[in-house]
Every structure is written in structure tokens, then in C-alpha cells.
Design a protein with these regions (language model features):
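Generic amphipathic alpha-helical segments used as scaffolds and interaction surfaces in large
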Residues: 137, 270, 287, 328-331
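A generic secondary-structure signal marking the coil-to-beta-strand transition
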Residues: 2, 234, 256, 277, ...
């Protein structure tokens, strides 16, 4: 099992990320190990007060970093107000813990099933521009998984334009460890090829602007300790429960801290929020494994089998179908299809899918696509 620790710091009520990893042994009466929270001094970063020490925004491990106010790493959110204001910094207001998993309006997401889930909702706000945010964390203890999402609400009188909304951000201190990044690329017929490379200073990302998640890049990213194997070493995984445009990114800063972000791709993304309106970001499923890649994949397998897949065939063998494409390509008729169906039926196959070529003059790839009537 794992521990995930946050802290509210500074007079600006920043939400800082303290720790994510193997379970820490402490009780309610033991002070949280806030010494793990990395802070520093920043003579060139503005602060709203005149203390001698300020949180170094350009290295501080923000839980949901804003934009344009001193943190020059990848942001989780960017906005533009009706007056052209682009800076945003969300600050802690309050929080609540509920014994359920709230559904995301209009979006696919995991569900609790028979398992008891705890959900932490952090209520944040930028009082200057009038933007409220709920950071939503649900823990699935048996699968050792945390799901994350964000709901934004315009509390101002004027519209706010969202130009970037990441669903999750994870800041890690890696001064004592080097890490690799693992992504899944591919194309037609060779989907989800594993590619592992060293995480270097700067940003490394995968994404899609195709209107779909695509097999060119899968909406997944993992951070691995340099010596991690299939069965040993640390692995942090993020997976996006969304089939549209996405961006998954890892950034190694000048101070050797890592920031992982995942969400809707900001390219060509603008969402107008009128007064009182809300925007829900899709869900990220994240997990930590101290037992290498196998530990991570087992977490995801268990999670999706129990809490994402729906329907009667979740726990039993599914019906089998046959597709005529590889057998006939464009050249088929009724007799050919019936012959395939009869042979398939003898093997226990229950459905025949008639593929490309049944409409119009579709005898090759150069004509008639979409020229059909039912």
C-alpha cells in the first residue's frame, strides 16, 4: 500500500505535494513528515508579503500549479479573463472527505462497485479572477490506486476562458535518484509499443490532437527509477480515462524535481465559462509500485476489471465474432459471406461482421467511401 501526503503552506495557502510512495508508518498522533516538503528561497519570485523567506515558486512542489505568477515549470491550468488577465493561482479554502465516489458529469469514469471508497475534495479558489476549483481524489485501497479529476467554476461576474486544464499534476523530488520515462507509441497493426528512455532536463511529452487518443500515442505515462525492472524498483503510472485529445508530460527542472501532468491537450482548446458555470476535467488514474512494472500493471488490471468495465461479460467469457475483411477484402458476395458464416458457426463463433466494401462501387480504397444507403 501507499501514502499520499499534502500540506497547506505559506500565508498564500498554497497546496503543496509532500509525498507519494510506499506507505509511511505513523498514526494520527504522529506529526506528518512535512520535512519532506521541498522549499527554498527566491529573491526573484514575487510574494504577497514581506517575509524574509518565501516559498520558492519555481521549485515548490505544487499540487495544482497555476500560471504566470512565478512558477515557470509546466502549469496545470491557464485562463484568460474578459479583461485579458492571464495569471491564475489557486489557493486552499477548505476541504471535505466523503464516503463515496462522485460521478463526473458527462464523462466516463471509474466507479466504486462493491468497494468502499474515500474521496478527498480540496476546495481552492483564485479570489482575484473569481475562479473556484475542486480537486477530487478518490482512493481505491484494494487496488492501491488513486483517481484524480478537477471541476472548475466561474464565480466572477464576467466570463472566464479556460485555455488549459490538466486533470492531474504530480511533483516529485528526485535529487537522490535518476528516473526513466515509459510511454506507449505505435501505428496500425503495432499498437502500444513500449518505449523507455532517460528523463533529461526539460520536458518530454506524448499527446494527440487528432480528436481521439489514437494508437500513435497512448494516453499513458510512467516514471521509473533508473534501475527498475519488471519486478523491482519504483514506478509511478498515470493513465487518462478519456478518448479525445490529450497531453501527458514529464519535466525535469533545474533543481532536479520532476513534474508530471496529464489532461486535455491545450492546443486549440478554449472553453468559455459564464458566471456560475462549471467545467469537469476527465479522470486520471494513478498508481505507485515498489515492485517494478509488474506491480503497476497488476494495479491497473485489477482496477479496470473491477471499477471501469461494465456489463454482464466483465467476469465471464465474451461472445466471439468473425470479420470477413482479411478473408475477402473488397471482393465478396452473398455466397462468400454465407460460406464464412457456416464454417465459423461450427467453431462456436456467434456473429459475422460484414466489413468494408458492401456499399456503392467500393471495390478499392479510392472510391465510394460513405456512398451508401440502408
Amino acid at each position: 500500500y501507499t501514502s499520499y501526503l499534502l500540506a497547506i503552506v505559506d500565508q498564500e495557502n498554497f497546496v503543496g505535494h509532500v509525498y507519494y510512495g510506499q506507505k509511511l508508518q505513523y498514526t494520527e498522533n504522529t506529526p506528518a513528515p512535512v520535512y519532506l516538503l521541498r522549499t527554498g528561497e527566491a529573491p526573484f519570485v514575487p510574494s504577497q508579503n514581506n517575509r524574509e523567506r518565501v516559498s520558492f515558486l519555481d521549485s515548490f512542489p505544487m499540487e495544482y500549479p497555476g500560471n504566470g505568477l512565478g512558477d515557470y515549470r509546466e502549469s496545470a491550468i491557464s485562463v484568460r479573463t474578459a479583461q485579458g488577465h492571464v495569471g491564475v493561482q489557486l489557493q486552499y479554502v477548505s476541504h471535505e472527505i466523503v464516503k463515496e465516489k462522485p460521478a463526473l458529469p458527462g464523462l466516463p469514469s471509474t466507479f466504486p462497485g462493491d468497494e468502499d471508497c474515500d474521496t478527498l475534495i480540496l476546495h481552492l479558489a483564485d479570489p482575484v479572477i473569481g475562479l473556484a476549483a475542486d480537486l477530487i481524489y478518490t482512493t481505491f485501497e484494494e487496488e492501491d490506486v488513486i483517481t484524480r479529476s478537477v471541476i472548475l467554476k466561474n464565480t466572477a461576474e464576467q466570463p472566464i476562458y479556460l485555455t488549459k486544464v490538466m486533470s492531474a499534476c504530480l511533483d516529485l523530488d528526485c535529487t537522490d535518484e535518476k528516473y526513466d520515462i515509459l510511454t506507449l507509441h505505435g501505428s496500425w497493426g503495432r499498437e502500444r509499443q513500449m518505449e523507455r528512455r532517460s528523463l533529461m532536463h526539460g520536458k518530454q511529452s506524448v499527446g494527440s490532437v487528432r480528436g481521439e487518443s489514437s494508437h500513435q500515442e497512448h494516453p499513458f505515462i510512467a516514471l521509473l527509477s533508473e534501475n527498475a525492472t519488471q519486478d523491482t524498483g519504483e514506478v509511478y503510472g498515470m493513465h487518462f480515462v478519456y478518448s479525445g485529445n490529450f497531453l501527458a508530460q514529464a519535466e525535469l527542472s533545474q533543481f532536479d524535481s520532476i513534474r508530471m501532468t496529464m489532461g486535455i491537450h491545450p492546443e486549440n482548446f478554449v472553453w468559455k465559462l459564464e458566471q456560475g458555470e462549471s467545467f469537469a476535467a476527465p479522470e486520471v488514474v494513478m498508481t505507485y509500485s515498489s515492485e517494478g512494472l509488474s506491480g503497476m500493471t497488476h494495479h491497473y488490471h485489477d482496477m479496470y476489471r473491477e471499477h471501469l468495465i461494465r456489463g454482464e461479460y466483465r467476469d465471464k467469457k465474451r461472445p466471439i465474432l468473425i470479420n470477413n475483411w482479411e478473408a475477402t477484402y473488397f471482393d465478396f458476395n452473398t455466397d462468400k459471406l454465407l460460406k464464412i458464416a457456416k464454417q465459423a458457426s461450427k467453431l462456436g463463433i456467434e456473429m459475422l461482421v460484414m466489413d468494408d466494401g458492401w456499399f456503392g462501387h467500393r471495390n478499392d480504397d479510392s472510391t465510394s467511401l460513405g456512398d451508401w444507403k440502408v
